[in-house]
């Protein structure tokens, strides 16, 4: 009986580890960057940022903005700034919902400005609070 209980616990532990590992993976159409998404509260606005791609050809992030007070009238491309490994990656483009409303979603894209290694810092201004999402891609 004791052996059966130990075996059951071992199976449950392995199943839990597989579930945890699967939750960290992206499904079809998900992130190929290998970087985790970030959810940040900026005052009354909640922002979810998922890195989709970050390499020497450029960067793209799936961005969701949600609020229940006021409208999201900002120009997301103009409000965004990306720095990778200390290098400014310049201006962004936005392919997504137009200004207005309580919920917006789209893809924020940057052309490459160099190496896709080091600390990644994506800031978004023009919101009720500061938004800074960071990741790190090891050199080499």
Protein language model features and the residues they cover:
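Low-complexity, acidic Ser/Thr/Pro/Gly-rich terminal tails and inter-domain linkers that flank the onset
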Residues: 32-56
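Short, solvent-exposed, Trp/other aromatic-anchored flexible loops in extracytoplasmic proteins
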Residues: 86-140
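Residue-level recognition of well-ordered beta-strand positions that form the cores
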Residues: 50, 62-66, 109, 123-125
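Bacterial N-terminal signal peptides that target proteins for export
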Residues: 1-13
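C-terminal motif of bacterial Sec signal peptides marking the signal peptidase cleavage site
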Residues: 18-22
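Mature extracytoplasmic domains of secretory-pathway proteins
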Residues: 55-99
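Bacterial signal peptide processing site
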Residues: 24-27
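Extracytoplasmic
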Residues: 42-44, 56-60, 77-79, 103-105, ...
């Amino acid at each position: 009986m004791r052996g059966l209980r130990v075996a059951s616990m071992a199976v449950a532990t392995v199943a839990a580890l597989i579930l945890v590992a699967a939750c960290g993976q992206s499904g079809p159409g998900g992130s190929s960057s290998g970087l985790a998404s970030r959810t940040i509260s900026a005052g009354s606005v909640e922002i979810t940022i998922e890195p989709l791609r970050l390499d020497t050809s450029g960067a793209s992030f799936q961005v969701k903005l949600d609020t229940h007070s006021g409208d999201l009238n900002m120009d997301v491309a103009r409000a965004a700034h990306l720095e990778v490994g200390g290098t400014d990656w310049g201006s962004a483009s936005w392919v997504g919902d137009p200004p207005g409303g309580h919920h917006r979603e789209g893809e924020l894209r940057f052309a490459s400005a160099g190496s896709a290694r080091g600390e990644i810092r994506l800031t978004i201004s023009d919101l009720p609070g500061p938004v800074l999402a960071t990741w790190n891609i090891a050199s080499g």
